[in-house]
């Protein structure tokens, strides 16, 4: 999805204006516990998408059902931005942290080339960059912005930025900006013996820090955009010849791949090694993952796609929501209306700021 990079920069400059967070804390998010039978509390009564979810899970966990799926084959994959957490404040966490690094972090100085490339991202239309060009350039810029930073220092950088407030939504930190109803979905699937994986376009290490303590997932269950890690004394030497030293640490290196669209399918095949039976997402960047889940699958499948149709509690996009809803209808996916199906999104204390 094409981003309004200028809006991102403007909103970053406003971060200091928000107040104390009163949303569900990370501890409260982590404590969400839905039973095998589905005692949901953050969904509206008789929400069609929630009922479709429960009906599917009941069918495939019933040993007497023709649609029964053995535990070993119960694999569910989730996109993250716009599916599990906020992507409209004003955009992805990943991109906002990069902008913070470039424009607000006084502890370092970006190169003139990196600043030039950032301007190209800010004015993609002017420079003739399409969505693919922008994604690739952003991946390279992000890698350069954190090049040489140790794994531990980078993880702490993410934790620190997580404490920033979400632009445009009151009482909400970025660390808390998860959709309560969707946190329930993961809890529900785990209670029904699903193996859950996050398959995101977000930087993998960033996402591991964001998800840590919220979802009961191991680091290996989190798949994202990749940047290479190298030894601190490697100095460009090929990994086939360099020997890790006792005084080495792992530091961030070059951009490898953006985990969106068909790349998500490749990552699932490579890292999970099983075809999912359930998939959750919110945009065309997830459609390949959806279709891979459905194609030639020996098991009954279910695909759920969130519609960004809530203009009162979130920064919805009616045109995008309509397009995604049509794709859902055309492909047999279950559309989840954030406006109609979510009783709350972040908690009742979080309000949209105009």
Q: Each predicted region: which residue ranges?
A:
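N-terminal secretory signal peptides that target proteins for export/translocation
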Residues: 1-2
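C-terminal cap/substrate-recognition subdomain and adjoining C-terminal extension
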Residues: 24-44, 58, 66, 73, ...
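Electropositive phosphate-/nucleotide-binding environments in soluble metabolic enzymes
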Residues: 47, 148, 262
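Short, solvent-exposed loop/turn elements at domain surfaces
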Residues: 63, 85-87, 231-232
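Generic recognition of cysteine residues
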Residues: 6, 11, 16-17, 86, ...
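Asp-based phosphoryl-transfer active-site loop
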Residues: 74-89, 290
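Non-catalytic pre-domain segments flanking phosphatase-related domains
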Residues: 5, 11-12, 19-80, 95, ...
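A metal-dependent, Asp-based hydrolase signature
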Residues: 89-92, 96-176, 180
């Amino acid at each position: 999805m094409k981003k309004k990079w200028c809006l991102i920069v403007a909103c970053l400059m406003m971060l200091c204006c928000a107040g104390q967070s009163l949303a569900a804390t990370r501890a409260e998010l982590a404590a969400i516990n839905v039973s095998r039978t589905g005692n949901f509390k953050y969904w509206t009564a008789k929400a069609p998408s929630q009922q479709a979810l429960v009906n599917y899970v009941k069918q495939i966990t019933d040993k007497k059902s023709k649609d029964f799926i053995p535990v070993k084959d119960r694999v569910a994959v989730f996109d993250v931005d716009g599916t599990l957490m906020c992507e409209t404040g004003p955009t992805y966490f990943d991109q906002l942290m990069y902008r913070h690094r470039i424009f607000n972090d006084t502890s370092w100085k970006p190169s003139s080339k990196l600043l030039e490339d950032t301007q190209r991202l800010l004015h993609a239309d002017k420079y003739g960059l399409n969505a693919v060009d922008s994604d690739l350039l952003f991946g390279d810029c992000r890698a350069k912005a954190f090049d040489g930073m140790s794994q531990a220092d980078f993880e702490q950088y993410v934790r620190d930025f997580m404490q920033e407030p979400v632009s445009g939504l009151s009482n909400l930190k970025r660390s808390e900006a998860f959709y309560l109803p969707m946190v329930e979905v993961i809890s529900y699937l785990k209670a029904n013996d699903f193996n859950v994986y996050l398959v995101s376009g977000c930087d993998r290490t960033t996402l591991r820090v964001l998800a840590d303590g919220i979802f009961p997932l191991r680091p290996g269950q989190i798949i994202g955009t990749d940047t290479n890690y190298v030894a601190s004394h490697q100095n460009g030497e090929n990994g086939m010849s360099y020997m890790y030293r006792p005084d080495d640490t792992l530091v961030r290196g070059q951009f490898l791949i953006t985990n969106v669209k068909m790349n998500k399918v490749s990552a699932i095949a490579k890292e999970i090694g099983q075809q999912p039976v359930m998939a959750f997402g919110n945009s065309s960047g997830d459609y390949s993952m959806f279709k891979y889940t459905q194609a030639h699958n020996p098991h009954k499948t279910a695909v759920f796609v969130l519609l960004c149709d809530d203009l009162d509690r979130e920064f919805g996009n009616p045109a995008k929501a309509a397009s995604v809803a049509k794709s859902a209808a055309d492909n047999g996916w279950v559309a989840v209306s954030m406006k109609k199906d979510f009783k709350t999104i972040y908690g009742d204390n979080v309000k949209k700021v105009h």
